Regions:
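Active-site-adjacent segment of FAD-dependent monooxygenases/related oxidoreductases
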Residues: 43-119
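Helical substrate-recognition/capping region of FAD-dependent monooxygenase/halogenase enzymes
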Residues: 2-8, 12, 27-28, 81-84, ...
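A conserved short coil-to-beta-strand element within the FAD-binding core of flavoproteins
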Residues: 127-141
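Core beta-strand elements of the Rossmann-like FAD/NAD(P) dinucleotide-binding domain
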Residues: 7, 149-159
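Conserved FAD-binding catalytic core of PHBH/FMO-like flavoproteins
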Residues: 69, 116, 159, 163-267
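FAD/FMN-dependent oxidoreductases across multiple families
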Residues: 70, 236-300, 320, 325, ...
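N-terminal Rossmann-fold NAD(P) dinucleotide-binding loop
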Residues: 18-19
Length: 564
């Protein structure tokens, strides 16, 4: 038996969630080990859909382009009868994102891309390594590992992160109950070729409704490749049975062939009560599992890892205290709980609505679904929910704001006083805990510039606006705010002064930091910045803090409370 020195982070599980966390820790220069008991990436891809918000996160990691090159986009979801009559059409393209679609990519291919990216960052996956047990101490966790050949190892880690799936060894070792239910039916799916009886769009998914149950087909990379999914199919997953499912539930004359793999599994709806216990934390399926309706499980897990990674980075480097990690549970547990509720309702609804056997009941169902789904507000709500762009942390303990009432300011303290209209317009800007909008704006010679790429890199970003006033006094105040952050946080904070012109103001001639020109005011309007204000953006792209007027004192007070 060998014993290693104290390790900052031990990650158990090298699926998409564990790999995402490892990539994040690499970027934040946090030493870690990533262990996985399997000897190769998964073959059976239960997960396949990547939604808009997850793709934004992968863009930040530098992976989105490669993922998009290998994946197949789906820009709409259709519910149809067996004779191709469309009942519901949900478009996913009307979003404020560079990724207005669902991407279909097998979990195996995603794992391979993440593993390759991790290797480029110097990270290693230690395969055929199993976590046997662990014991928590005051300031570390003692972990017992087993390797091939009966070799054992003791690892002492400051933090143990369980990304080891639904049967998590870490969760079981913590004794946390996995609260919820198991559905009475099973899910059967396969990666197959489908020759449709009539030509179909290659960028749309379809669910066929029949008296025998639903049958879904999602486009995959490759010629005529699809993920074929059947709920409550009693037969074993064989090619003959998938053809039978198509004959019974899908359109006539369609041929299923060339399966790459086929699988059947039970689906659950479960979640732990807390994501952190001492120095052990849970991510992804180790913390929550639910029905695959909506394809949000993988996305929720990846976003768990993305939320936790930057916080571990700040704690490791001594910028923040250990208590910051408590916010991981406070922010991510409610998100998964909402997903569980919505997918549970949808799954149970499928069991009732989609298996109506009588013609009149099906006709009534189809008419009601067609009417409701045609409403623009329903379309937008469904699309936003699927994309996960509306995920927010409004009730998080680590977000906040300070906004002075217009009549409470004199304007003689170096700050510019907002008017009453300025006050209300600022209130309509992105609230603390909200995702930062990916604003398109014109700047210098660039006709279509995006905001989010300017906020990549894993740092906190401070957006400093002087509003419409654009006075020398206002700009001097903004530079003072930026200068006050530099001695405390160095390059972990990036300050951007945003000006409503095409030229650098004379008052900023000596400003060496980031200057964003916003001559048409797109950024100012998006952030409600009619007057002087600031926004602090977290490394994961959410608003941490905002103030009107821009105040370095209130910003530093906030950071002192959050980081400790």
């Amino acid at each position: 038996m060998s014993t290693q020195p104290l390790l900052p982070v031990l990650i158990v599980g090298a699926g998409p969630v564990g790999l995402t966390l490892a990539c994040e820790l690499s970027r934040h220069k946090v030493p870690f080990r990533l262990i996985e008991q399997a000897d190769a990436p998964t073959l059976y891809s239960k997960a396949q859909i990547l939604h808009s918000r997850t793709l934004e996160l992968f863009e930040d990691l530098g992976l989105a382009t490669r993922i998009c090159e290998q994946a197949r986009p789906a820009r709409a979801l259709n519910l149809c009868t067996r004779d191709w009559q469309r009942i519901v059409h949900v478009a996913v393209g009307e979003q404020d994102t560079a990724y207005p679609y669902m991407l279909n990519l097998s979990q195996r291919d995603l794992e391979l891309l993440l593993a390759e990216h991790l290797a480029s960052l110097g990270g290693v996956i230690e395969r055929r390594v199993h976590l046997n047990s662990f014991e928590q101490k005051d300031d570390h966790v003692v972990c017992s590992l087993s390797h091939e050949g009966d070799r054992t190892e003791t690892v002492m880690a400051r933090y143990l992160i369980g990304c080891d799936g639904a049967h998590s060894t870490v969760r079981k070792g913590l004794g946390l109950p996995f609260i919820g239910d198991t559905y009475e039916w099973r899910l059967t799916q396969a990666d197959v070729r489908i020759d449709w009886s009539i030509a179909q769009p290659t960028d749309e998914a379809v669910v066929f409704l029949s008296a025998q149950g639903p049958l879904a087909a999602f486009p995959l990379p490759g010629e005529r490749r699809y993920r074929l999914i059947a709920f409550d199919a009693p037969e074993e997953p064989t090619l003959a049975n998938f053809q039978k499912l198509m004959d019974e539930r899908g359109p006539t004359g369609c041929r299923v062939s060339d399966p790459h793999w086929m699988v059947q599994f039970t689906i659950h709806c479960r979640q732990v009560e807390r994501y952190r216990s001492g120095r052990a934390l849970l991510c992804g399926d180790a913390a929550h599992i639910h029905s695959p309706v909506g394809g949000q499980g993988l996305n929720t897990g990846v976003q768990d890892a993305y939320n936790l990674g930057w916080k571990l980075g700040l704690v490791h480097h001594g910028i923040a205290k250990d208590a910051l990690l408590d916010s991981y549970h406070e922010e991510r547990h409610p998100v998964a709980a909402t997903v569980l509720r919505s997918t549970d309702s949808a799954t149970k609804g499928l069991g009732v609505l989609l298996k109506l056997s009588s013609d009149w009941a099906q006709h009534l169902r189809n008419g009601a679904m067609r009417f409701v789904s045609s409403l623009s507000m329903v379309q937008r709500a469904a699309s936003r929910s699927l994309s996960e762009l509306d995920v927010a942390y409004y009730k998080s303990p680590i977000v906040g704001q300070v906004q002075s009432m217009p009549w409470n300011r004199s304007g003689d303290d170096g700050h510019e006083s907002p008017g009453l209209r300025d006050y209300f317009v600022f209130g309509d800007g992105p609230a603390p805990g909200a995702r930062v909008p990916d604003v398109h704006f014109v700047s210098e010679q660039v006709d279509d510039r995006r905001l989010l790429p300017l906020l990549h890199g894993g740092q906190h970003h401070v957006l400093l606006f002087d509003g419409a006033a654009a006075t020398p006094e206002g700009y001097r105040n903004l530079t003072r705010i930026a200068d006050s952050l530099s001695p405390l946080y160095g390059d972990r904070f990036v300050c951007h002064i945003i000006v409503p012109s095409l030229e650098r103001p004379e008052a900023l001639i000596d400003w060496n930091g980031s200057l964003i020109l916003d001559p048409r005011g797109e950024l100012h309007r998006a952030f409600g910045a009619r007057s002087e204000c600031l926004y602090l953006i977290r490394p994961d792209g959410y608003v941490a803090f905002r103030s009107q007027p821009a105040s370095g004192e209130t910003l530093l007070d906030f950071l002192g409370q959050i980081f400790g």
